[in-house]
Amino acid sequence: MKKSPGLSDYLWAWTLFLSTLTGRSYGQPSLQDELKDNTTVFTRILDRLLDGYDNRLRPGLGERVTEVKTDIFVTSFGPVSDHDMEYTIDVFFRQSWKDERLKFKGPMTVLRLNNLMASKIWTPDTFFHNGKKSVAHNMTMPNKLLRITEDGTLLYTMRLTVRAECPMHLEDFPMDAHACPLKFGSYAYTRAEVVYEWTREPARSVVVAEDGSRLNQYDLLGQTVDSGIVQSSTGEYVVMTTHFHLKRKIGYFVIQTYLPCIMTVILSQVSFWLNRESVPARTVFGVTTVLTMTTLSISARNSLPKVAYATAMDWFIAVCYAFVFSALIEFATVNYFTKRGYAWDGKSVVPEKPKKVKDPLIKKNNTYAPTATSYTPNLARGDPGLATIAKSATIEPKEVKPETKPPEPKKTFNSVSKIDRLSRIAFPLLFGIFNLVYWATYLNREPQLKAPTPHQ
């Protein structure tokens, strides 16, 4: 006999429907229960890992050498200071090693933790050998990451800003290239206890972000990695080295130094085309260009450290200074010979004065008349001939036309100096040859892409 459904059956159906809507069913835990269970599992795993753990002891103490694998991701490179010979770099510094004491078994394969756990376990005492100042970012919390896998392998990542030394050889400045190193290793553990290795192959162990360059005067050509051993009084230590290869941009220095020097030399050679009697003009050309070169040489050195050797720019400025100073000396030489009595063509510089000719005529009222001699007749003696002589000796002055002035002597000017003629050709030719050799030598040099790392 079939039994009709009762009140209990209706209640069972409604209970099953409501449990379906709320995500619950008989025999299955709720989501909150699952999260609570996972949190409990995490807590128990961490408590078990740290139970009896001594973070003062390195992994494998007394059994094996601890291997620390590293790689670097550069988020920002620069700026570079030539004066202080240093550079600034912002990196994500990653280290990985294995600690058997941190093995675990659980529903998860990786424990993702933050800096709080990192302070409770052993971590490598890595420091930067050539670092002047290193800063670990702490805003808003310490920028540190820790991952622990079930086999005890740890990944420890931190964000650092490092200001490191970059030894520079400025002989080729400003066509120079540099390899700025970043050296790091263990501070306390020798290579018998802790060794460092690159995580990946050399080409991928250090990576620079595409937009990571913060350089105005340099091009970042690339980077290379290396490793070596450094001997000290406390033992031998493994040192990992990364070289960042830089090539200086020359555009700024062409505009600020090279072009002004070239234009100053050309301006100094304009004086060769001026008349050698133009002493003030040629003196102004010479003195002004010499002072200009002096100012340029001083300003070019302001951005560089006080090195004891001459740079490529120093040689260029020195040669330009020599050309400008030689132009001034050339004018002094020409002027010295110009002051003498004869020019280079043998003609007299001082015009000859016309000789004075005595004129027997007397000028009177713009007329010329010969000198008249009067004889007084002696009538007392009664000599009739004397009266005749007196009469004939007196000659009335005749009007004479004014005599034309003698032609002025032809003025003799100094011809163009032979020294000036020679300088007009020699100076530009020599300066052009110098520029050709200078730029061909320095621009065709290949940058040194590999800096040596000492191995011992």
From Swiss-Prot:
Molecular function GO terms recorded: GABA-A receptor activity; GABA-gated chloride ion channel activity
Inhibition and activation profile: Allosterically activated by benzodiazepines, the neuroanesthetic alphaxalone and pentobarbital. Inhibited by the antagonist bicuculline. Potentiated by histamine.
Ranges annotated as spanning the membrane: 254-274, 280-301, 312-333, 422-441
Disulfide bridge positions per record: 166-180
Ranges in the topological domain labelled Extracellular: 28-253, 302-311, 442-456
Keywords: Cell membrane, Chloride, Chloride channel, Cytoplasmic vesicle, Disulfide bond, Glycoprotein, Ion channel, Ion transport, Ligand-gated ion channel, Membrane, Postsynaptic cell membrane, Receptor, Signal, Synapse, Transmembrane, Transmembrane helix, Transport
UniProt-annotated location(s): Postsynaptic cell membrane; Cell membrane; Cytoplasmic vesicle membrane
Entry comment describing in which tissues the protein is expressed: Cerebellar granule cells, Purkinje cells and stellate/basket cells.
InterPro entries, sorted: GABAA/Glycine_rcpt, GABAAa_rcpt, GABBAa1_rcpt, Gabra-1-6_TM, GABRA1_ECD, Neur_chan_lig-bd, Neur_chan_lig-bd_sf, Neur_channel
Family to which the UniProt record says this protein belongs: Belongs to the ligand-gated ion channel (TC 1.A.9) family. Gamma-aminobutyric acid receptor (TC 1.A.9.5) subfamily. GABRA1 sub-subfamily.
Protein name: Gamma-aminobutyric acid receptor subunit alpha-1
Lineage: Eukaryota, Metazoa, Chordata, Craniata, Vertebrata
Gene giving rise to this polypeptide: GABRA1
